[in-house]
Amino acid sequence: MAALGTGGYVRNDAVEKLPTIMAGVPARRAQSSPPPAPPLCLRRRTRLTAAPEDAVQNRVSLEKVLGITAQNSSGLTCDPGTGHVAYLAGCVVVILNPKENKQQHILNTARKSLSALAFSPDGKYIVTGENGHRPAVRIWDVEEKNQVAEMLGHKYGVACVAFSPNMKHIVSMGYQHDMVLNVWDWKKDIVVASNKVSCRVIALSFSEDSSYFVTVGNRHVRFWFLEVSTEAKVTGTVPLVGRSGILGELHDNVFCGVACGRGQMAGSTFCVSYSGLLCQFNEKRVLEKWINLKVSLSSCLCVSQELIFCGCTDGIVRIFQAHSLHYLANLPKPHYLGVDVAQGLEPSFLFHRKAEAVYPDTVALTFDPNHQWLSCVYKDHSIYIWDVKDINKVGKMWSELFHSSYVWNVEVYPEFEDQRACLPSGSFLTCSSDNTIRFWNLDSNPDSHWQKNIFSDTLLKVVYVESDIQHLQDMSHFPDRGSENGMAVDMKAGVRVMQVSPDGQHLASGDRSGNLRIHELHFMDELVRVEAHDAEVLCLEYSKPETGLTLLASASRDRLIHVLNVEKNYSLEQTLDDHSSSITAVKFTGSRDIQMISCGADKSIYFRSAQQASDGLHFVRTHHVAEKTTLYDMDIDITQKYVAVACQDRNVRVYNTVNGKQKKCYKGSQGDEGSLLKVHVDPSGTFLATSCSDKSISVIDFYSGECVAKMFGHSEIITGMKFTYDCRHLITVSGDSCVFIWHLGPEITNCMKQHLLEIDQREQPQQNTKDGKWSRDPRQETCTSMPSEISLSPGEQTEDELEEECEPEELLKTPSKESLDSDPRCLLTNGKLPLWAKRLLGDDDVADGSAFHAKRSYQPHGRWAERADQEPLKTILDARDLDCYFTPMKPESLEDSILDTVESQRLAGLLSQSESPQEDGCRHPSLTPPQRESSEVSELLCSLESEVTITGTDSKPCAEEGEGAPGDQQDDFYLRVPSITSKDLNPPEDSGESEADLECSFTAVHSPPRPDPDPPFDVAVPPAPGCPGATEELARPEVPGLSNGSLPQTPEQEKFLRHHFETLTDAPAEELFHGSLRDLKASEAKDDFFNPRLSISAQFLSRFQKPSRFTHTFPTRLPRHPMQSPEVKLTDLAGSQPRAEPLRAGTGYTSPGRTNVLSAGKAEEPLEAWSPLTSCLTGLAPCVSSSSVPPTDKTPPTPTALPTPGLAQGVHTPATSSYVEATAGSRAKMSRSISLEDSKGPVLAELARPPCRPSSLGELSSLGQELRAITTTVTPSSDSEGQEPALPSRGNHEARASLKLTLSSICDRLLLPPPQLEPSAMCVWSQEPVAIQPNVMVTTASFSAPSPVNVSASRLHNSTFLPRFLAPEPLNTSAHPNSPPLPEARPGVPGNITSLLESAPDALSPVHRCPGHCGQPRVPARVPPPGPLELSNVGSIVHRLQTAFQEALDLYHMMVSRDEVSAEQQQAQTELASTFLWIHSQLEANDWLVGTDGAPAQALPSPGPPSPPTLCPLASPDLHALLEHYSELLVQAVRRKAQRD
C-alpha cells in the first residue's frame, strides 16, 4: 500500500461509502454506485481503462501487524497524553492502543526499514529514522498518517532521534559509520547545528528545559549544549558545543541507555552500562554515584519523576528510587522461553515459576506517566505493558508474543462445516527460524474449544520443533554485547515450510536442516520425524482431496522430491531427481490425470502424471518446459487447469496443466527492479498476489494481468502469502519477523465471492458425475479424476479463450492412434518450426504438435536429404523408426502387450534393507516374494509346455507385476515394440523437448520400415527373464550393420559423436562420492564421508556413489525379474567354516569394501568390473564368493571405472548423482549419446593385446553383437552386501527408455578381433579351488542358476565364436590331462537332474576356460570317455526325465496354488523355480552342442581363417558394398582418434 502526496497513507472515504455487494448478486447492478474504479469482474467485458493510481493504492489496507523489529529503546516510544505505544515493525510504525487492542499504522513510503522513532511531547507527531544509504529523518502526522517533513543529512543510517521538550528541534544521530549528529529545525527543514562524534552513539535524551541533550555510547557520555543566542545571530549551521562527562574509573564502560531527570531530579542525568552499572551525573557533568545492578548484562533505561527502571538480562527489570538510587523491587518476569501459551488460561499462570527456566532479555523500555504504564520489549520479540501504579502489586495490562526471527511460510487452516476442525474458523499458521510454528486467530469471538490465553489475544498455540531455546531469542542483533552466552548460533535452524493436510488433521513441516515432521493437530503431538533431505526443505504439498489420494510431496534444496504415502504412515513411495538445482515449488493437481508439477532454480518446469503400479504409485514425466529465467514459485487456480509461475524476470507465466503450454504472460511487479519471489492465487481463482524482491506486494487480475492493488510495508523480502477463505484478507510474512494482515477492499472481496458462486452453480450439475477413483487399464493404471468443466472465468473469457474451450478436450492430450501408421518425419516441440519442416508436413500454418500427418511428399535438401533416406541403412535421426515411441496407442490396441507398467524407483526396500542387512542375506530388498516368483516361472513353464518361439519383432519387454525392483527396466527397450505407449515411455510431442534432444536419440536399432505384417526378417534380442518367452530360442539371426546399434554407421554419425561428446571421460579419476549405503553407517576415524546424515536423500544419492560417473551419462536398466541362484558352498583357504550364501550367477556379486585380486601386476579392482567381461568371452558366469577374497581396508572404496560404458549398462552400476554433474537438460541429452573416448577402465592382462584391424566386416559385426548381448543381458552386480541396487529411473526418464544409446566406447576393443581360445585353454568351473594368486583360492561352481548371461552368451557363441573355437579339431579329453574334473554333484540341482546330466557328459564338456585364470595350473579332468549309445539307456533316460519333470511340475503347481506358504515351502518353491530356469537354459545350450558335434563334415567350418557369418541376406550387393565402405571409414576414424589420444 502506498501513500498519497507526501507519502503518508490516507484512508479512502469513497471506498468505505461503497454499498456492499452481496455474494451472488451480479456485478452489473453495482454500477449505479460510482466506485473509484470499475468493478473488477466487469473489466474484461467492458475493457475500460485502468483505475486511478490512488484507487489502486487504497483497494487494500493494512489491518494488523503481528511482529516487532525494535532492537533497543530507540525503537519504542509512548505518547504521554493518550498512552498509545508506538513501535517499529519493518517499514511500518505501529501505534497501539492497549486498552482497545487496536492498531494504527504509518507506512514508510521510501520502503526503507525504520530504525528509530519518538513521539512529540504533545503526541501529534512522530519522528522516524531510517536504515540504509542516505536515510531520511521524517516527521509524520499521527492523526492523518501522512508525512509532514523529510530531512536528509545522514549517509549510513539513523541510530536514534528525539524531539526537544519545547518541540523546536529534533536531534538525530547517525550510525557508527556515519557519526554525524544533527540538530534540526524541523518546521523550516534545516540543520541548525551539527558535529561529528568519534565513537558509536547508542542512545540520547533531552533535558527537561531543552537546553542540552546527552548522548552515550562506547566509552562515551557527552553533554551537548544549544546556544539560543548564537542560533538567533547565525543563519547557517554552527558546530555543536559538547562536553564529556567525567567518568573517572568507569571510563572503559559501554553505556547503552540514558535519561535526563524529571521534576525534582531535572538537573541529574542517569546512564546504564552493558556491564550492569547504573550511574548518576549532576549538573556539572560529574559522576556523582553509581551502583551495581548485580546482573550479567543490562540494556536499557527509562525514568519518571520518582522511579528509575533498568532493563536487564533474563527478563529482569529493576526499579530504583530516582532521588536516592535505592533499590525498590523487580518487575514480574514475562513468560519463560518455551512456554505453552495454550496452558496459560489463568492469570496466576504468569507468576508460576518453572525450575531452571530461561527468560528473554529486556531490550527496550518506555514509560507512560499518565497511566503509570511501563512498556517492555523483550529479546524474543514479545511486548508486555505493566501497570506499575503500585510497585508491590504490579499487573499486566497487555501482552503479545511474536516471532523472533525470519518468518518463512504461512498457511490458512481449511474451513469445515462439521466438527472435524481442530482449530477455530479463520485460523492461520506461521513458521519461523525461531524453531516455532505459531497458530493465530484474529476472531474476537472466543471459541468454546479454544479459550483465550493470558499471553495473547491472537496467539492460540506455539509448537516448538526443537528443545533448544537459543533460537527463541533474536540473535541477529548484538549491540556490542559480544558473545556473552559463549555459544555459537546456528543460523540454519528453524522451520522453513509447512502444509496443512486437506482434512485438517495433520501438519507437515520441513526445517532448514532437511528434516520432515508430521504433527497431529488435535493434541499437537509429533507423529513422524524423518531425516528426509540433506538441505533445507523448500516446499511441501499434500495431494488434493478430489484425487482420492493422500500423498505428501517434499522438495528441497538438494534437488530431490520425495513422495510419501500418508495412508501408509508417510512411507516413501518414490524419489524424483529430474531437477538439477533447488526445487522452489511442487504442486498437485487433479485435473484429468492426477499430476505433480514442480519448478526450480534450474529454469525447468516438470509435469508428471501418476501411474498405479503393482508396487505402488509412481509419477512419470509427461512434459518439460525449459524457460530462460529462474522460477521461484507457482500456484494452481481453483479450476486445476492453469498454473501461475513467478519468474525472475518479474513476469507471471500461466501454463496449462494438461499440455504444459504457456497461456499467458504478464507483468507481476510494478517496479523495474528485483525478481518475483512468491505467487498465490486466491480461493476463487480471480486474482493472484505476487511478491517481489523489492519488498512490494501486488494483487493482479489472474485473467487480464491488470494490477488491482499494490502494497508495501515489509522491510525484508516477502517469504509467504495466503488469501483467507472468507476472501477478506491477505496474509503476508517476511524475513523481518513480521506478519501483516491486509484487508481487501469490498470490490475485490465481492468479485471473488461472485466468482465462487458462479463456480458452485456450474459444479452442481456435475456432482453426480464426479469420480476421483483410479482409471484402471489392463496394461496400466493412471490416476484420473473427472475434468472440471469450469471455464477460465465464467462468462468473462476473451475471444481466443472461448475458441479454445470450443475445441475438443482430446486436443489437449497427446493424440492417440488406432494403428501403427507412420508419424511425421520431424518430431515437433513447443518451439517454432523451420520452413522446411512446415513444408515437409504439408502445412505452413502448423503451430501445434497435437495431430500431424504428412500431406505431400516433400524431400528436404542439403544435409537433411540423408535423414529422409528410404534405404535400410539409417542415419542419426529418422522419425519413422520412432513412430511407435511418440504417439500413444488406444487401449484396445494393447490387448496382447506384455508391457504392464513402467515403474519408477522406490526407496522403501532400500531403507528397510539398510536397517537389517543381515536378515535378507544377499537378497535384493525389493526381490520378488515366492508368490511373485511363482507367477514368473509359471509363464516360463507355459512357454516350455507349448513350445512357443517368440521372434524379435513379437517379443516385448515386460515389467513386473509384483513388488520388484522398481525402475529396473529391460535393456531391450531399443527394439521396435509396437505396443508400447508413448504415454508410458516417452514425453508427448508438446512436452518442451527440443529437436536437439531427439537428435541424440539415434541409439535405437534402426530396423527398416515394415511395409507388410510379415517382413522378410526380424530383429530379435532376447527379453529378460521373467517375461513370456524370455528363455525362448531366437528364431532368426540378426542382420549385420542393422541390428548393431552400438556402432556409428556413417561418418556423419561419427562426426556427430566427436563434436558433442569429445569432452566426456569414461574414467574420472576424481570422484567426489565415496562409499555406498553401507558406508553411511557409523563413521570411523579415517572415514571422510561427505555427509554424515542418514537422510532419505543421502541414501538415495549413496546408491550412485560407488560406480564410475561416466556411467551416469547412460541410463542403465536392470532385468525386470532378477533371479536367485541356488546356494553354493564356498570354502575359504584360511580355514573358515564353509557357509552357504546365495549368490547371483554370472553377476560377479561381491560385498562392498571387498575386491577381487586379479593377475599379478594389476591393481585390485572389484569383481564386478571384470566378471561380466569374463562371462562375455567364455559364455560361462563364474560365481565367486566374497568370503574367498581377503578383505581390504575399511575405508570407503574408491570409485571403480568399469571397462566400458556398454559394459556398465549391462552390469548396471547406478549412475552417480551429485551436485557437480550436468544439469537436467544436459543430462537428458547425454543419456542418449556416448563418447568415442578410449576406455581407461581396467582390462584383464590376458586380453591386453595391441589393437589390430578386424579382417572383415563380419568380425567387426560379430564383436558388436557380442557387446550388444553383454550390455543387454548381463545381470548387475551389487555394491552393497545383502542387497542389489535397483537403479532408479533417473528422475522419471522412462519417457526416454526406448531412446537409450548402448554404443560401446572402448575403441581398442572395437579394433580387436574376437579372442581365439584354443581347446587346451578351456576348463570347467568346478567346486575345487582354483588359484588366482598365491595364497588366494577361489572356489567356483560348475553349474549355476540360469541368468541372462548363460542364456544369451551361449546363444551368442553358437552363432559367432564357438564354431570357430571348436570346429577345427574335435575335443579330445585325453589330450588335456590338466583339465579340471566335472563335479560329482551340482549345488542347487536335484539329484535326479544331476544323474541325468551325468549320463550325458558330452553335452557339457566344451566349456571355456576363464580368461582371468589363464596361465595358472590346471587340475586334471576326470571325464569318462563316451560310451556306446544304447537304446535301453536312452529309453530309461527319457522315462526318468519325463517322470522327474512331471513330479517337479506338479509339486510346483501345488505349492503355488496354496495361499499360505511356510518358510520351508518358500525355499523349496524357490529351488524348483531356479531349477526349471536352469533346465531351460541347458536345453538351449544343448541344441547348439548337439548341432556342432553331430553336424555333417561339410557343415563344419574349415580350420582356416573363419569367414564372417552371414546372419541375414543383405538386400542387395550394392548395400553390402556400402556397408563395407562405411566399416572401413569407421575403423579409420577410430584409429585416428586412438592415435591422437
UniProtKB/Swiss-Prot annotation:
It is found in: Nucleus; Cytoplasm, Cytoskeleton, Spindle pole; Cytoplasm, Cytoskeleton, Microtubule organizing center, Centrosome; Cytoplasm, Cytoskeleton, Microtubule organizing center, Centrosome, Centriole. Residues 1008-1026, 1193-1202 have a biased composition (Pro residues). InterPro entries: Quinoprotein_ADH-like_sf, WD40/YVTN_repeat-like_dom_sf, WD40_MABP1-WDR62_1st, WD40_MABP1-WDR62_2nd, WD40_repeat_dom_sf, WD40_rpt, WDR62, WDR62-MABP1_CC. Residues 781-795 have a biased composition (Polar residues). GO terms for biological process: cerebral cortex development. Residues 937-948 have a biased composition (Low complexity). WD repeats lie at residues 109-150, 153-194, 196-234, 291-330, 357-396, 402-450, 490-529, 532-574, 578-618, 626-665, 671-713, 714-752, 803-846, 1138-1180. One of its GO terms (cellular component) is centriole. It comes from the Eukaryota. Required for cerebral cortical development. Plays a role in neuronal proliferation and migration. Plays a role in mother-centriole-dependent centriole duplication; the function seems also to involve CEP152, CDK5RAP2 and CEP63 through a stepwise assembled complex at the centrosome that recruits CDK2 required for centriole duplication. This is WD repeat-containing protein 62. It comes from Sus scrofa (Pig).
